[in-house]
Amino acid sequence: MADLATFIRGLPKAELHLHIEGSLEPEQMFAFSRRNKVAIPFGSVEEIRGAYAFSNLQDFLDIYYQGANVLQTEEDFRDLALAYFERLHADGGRHAEIFFDPETHTDRGLPFSIAIEGLLAGMKEAEARYGVTSKLIMCFLRHLDEASSLKTLKAAEPWLDRIAGVGLDSSEKGHPPSKFARVFQAARERGLKICAHAGEEGPPAYVHEALDILR
């Protein structure tokens, strides 16, 4: 069994669905909260780890957004990305397509540039250090309104040559894909590829909308 595990670890791999903010390890969350003097509702790494025993999407999103609050600087986003790429490299990863949620950060007052410049720096360093290539996919938060997603797409314009596509994530109930038809059309017009989460919590109609309206 150990030989099989070693063999599998050594195989070249591509990770095509990774939410970078969701890769924040408990140790990193605790360290970043101290570094940036950001309060979190946990007293130890062990408490954070225990909070990851979620039973539904919303429970996961609650701790996901709590963790995102500790990300304050370009250095934080760079370190977050590098830590992920180090783990990916150790598992034989050669390529990754990374989702990031700029509205998670701009909605709490960070400039758009902080997150994307930090992530791009981490991606560049990971390629130089580990030979791991990567692409960036910008997600819109479906619990926010269409105006917020259109504003985010506008803010992303200086970096469109570094963004491979757009996605749609966060709380699904009550937020059908059709809510974002205009922003996805605008993204396509800018040459961005399209993807979207659908059907995790919502009805089958949401899957149809993602395929028929957002495509």
For each predicted feature, which ranges?
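Metal-cofactor-binding active-site regions of metalloenzymes
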Residues: 1-192, 201-215
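Active-site glycine-centered loops adjacent to acidic/histidine catalytic or metal-binding residues
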Residues: 197
